């Protein structure tokens, strides 16, 4: 019943593009809006993203690349953060990776191969925008996988900052990934079949050992991790955090005890997304407003376009 109500509310939020002449895009802090968008407009770019004519400004010189997580896609993941960033003056780009083109279920393939896909996409963004580097914001696997690109594929020269929302930096468990699969249409089938990225994200995998050998970070980029203590996918939740210089680790409940968001809903959590804005523009950072945020659905904001 709760999901049905949320979907009904989300119908009015989902717009594939902004109306002609609109100054801002709506920002639906509701995970149901993402599922609805992916159902009605599968494979579509998140609102405001992938404008290849966008040019970065002096205030925001780095385009932002959004990287979704396991079993997800760019459409269901970024219906809130993409328009929020565009409304705040950023050039925003998003991709699907790690799955068959047109498949709703993405990010199940070999993670180093996905990192190479990210690298090719970053090169395209840099060439189109004329920027020297990008900022990367990722969720779950999408917050961890760019670290492979940064460490092994030259991303230390092209990434200015990596912001991870509940990233699987040090792995997860079988039960954690199974619960994540249930959150996305088609996820359980993919989890029950061939999901190389799932195996690579299990705690103690050879992939994670290689990724984290010699330290969590490399010189050059800055790193921000935003996590919720109610994460039941990345467990313990503190395993999302990184150690090293130029690292900021944020636990949402340290800012707001009323934030009850979980692993899935964090990408539609107004408090978490405000923290993303702060990470990308620390000089203009402001404290997020503390308000009730629900598990799974997210929330905590209004449809204000900011």
How does the language model describe each region?
Residues 84-102:
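Conserved alpha/beta-hydrolase
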Residues 71, 99-101, 169:
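Alpha/beta-hydrolase active-site loop signature
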Residues 218-306:
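C-terminal catalytic-base region of ester-bond hydrolases, centering on the histidine
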Residues 56-60, 85-87, 128-129, 137-138, ...:
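Extracellular/periplasmic catalytic domains that process cell-envelope and extracellular macromolecules
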Residues 1-88, 291-306:
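Flexible, membrane-associating and regulatory peripheral segments of lipid-active enzymes
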Residues 69-72, 103-109, 196-198, 260-266:
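Second-shell loop/turn segments in exported
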Residues 67-68, 92, 112-212:
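Serine-dependent carboxylesterase/thioesterase catalytic core
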């Amino acid at each position: 019943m709760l999901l049905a109500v949320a979907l009904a509310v989300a119908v009015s939020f989902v717009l594939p593009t902004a109306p002609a002449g609109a100054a801002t895009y709506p920002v639906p802090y509701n995970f149901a809006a993402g599922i609805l968008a992916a159902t009605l407009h599968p494979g579509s770019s998140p609102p405001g993203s992938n404008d290849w004519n966008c040019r970065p400004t002096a205030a925001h010189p780095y385009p932002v690349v959004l990287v979704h997580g396991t079993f997800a896609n760019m459409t269901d993941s970024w219906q809130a953060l993409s328009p929020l960033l565009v409304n705040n003056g950023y050039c925003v780009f998003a991709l699907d990776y790690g799955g068959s083109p047109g498949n709703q279920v993405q990010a199940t393939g070999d993670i180093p191969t996905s990192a190479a896909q990210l690298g090719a996409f970053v090169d395209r963004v840099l060439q189109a925008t004329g920027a020297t580097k990008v900022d990367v914001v990722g969720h779950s696997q999408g917050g961890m996988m760019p670290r492979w690109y940064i460490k092994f594929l030259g991303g230390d020269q092209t990434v200015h900052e990596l912001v991870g929302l509940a990233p699987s930096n040090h792995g997860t468990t079988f039960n954690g990934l199974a619960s994540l699969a249930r959150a996305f249409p088609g996820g359980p089938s993919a989890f029950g079949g061939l999901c190389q990225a799932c195996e690579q994200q299990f705690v103690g995998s050879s992939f994670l050992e290689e990724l984290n050998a010699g330290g969590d970070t490399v010189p050059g980029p800055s790193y921000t991790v935003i996590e919720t203590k109610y994460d039941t996918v990345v467990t313990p939740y503190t395993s999302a955090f990184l150690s090293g210089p130029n690292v900021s680790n944020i636990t949402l409940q340290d800012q707001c005890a009323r934030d009850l968001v979980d692993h899935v809903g964090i990408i539609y959590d107004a408090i978490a997304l405000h923290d993303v804005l702060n990470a990308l523009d620390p000089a203009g950072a402001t404290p997020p407003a503390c308000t009730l945020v629900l598990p799974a659905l997210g929330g905590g904001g209004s449809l204000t376009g900011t």
